[in-house]
UniProtKB/Swiss-Prot annotation:
InterPro entries: KOW, Rib_uL2_dom2, Ribosomal_uL24, Ribosomal_uL24_CS, Ribosomal_uL24_KOW, Translation_prot_SH3-like_sf. It comes from Sulfurimonas denitrificans (strain ATCC 33889 / DSM 1251) (Thiomicrospira denitrificans (strain ATCC 33889 / DSM 1251)). This is Large ribosomal subunit protein uL24. One of two assembly initiator proteins, it binds directly to the 5'-end of the 23S rRNA, where it nucleates assembly of the 50S subunit. One of the proteins that surrounds the polypeptide exit tunnel on the outside of the subunit. Belongs to the universal ribosomal protein uL24 family. GO terms for cellular component: ribonucleoprotein complex; ribosome. It comes from the Bacteria. Part of the 50S ribosomal subunit.
Amino acid sequence: MAKFKFKKGDTVEIIAGDDRGTKATVLAVLPKKNKVIVEGCKIVKKAIKPTEENTKGGHLNKEMPIDVSNVRKVEA
């Protein structure tokens, strides 16, 4: 298995997709899936069903993983 070049806390730039040109911080690394989760990028709205703790339910904005081929490390 090849060494993964990103780690949590790195500053990266999105080089492909809707968020192209955005510089942000890596929140999580998923080496088995070859993806990273970047702060504030690729945000989707998830529906939350009502539960005992959250009786209303509602919507949650969540960052989704981005393939590492679409991300470039930026030297701080």
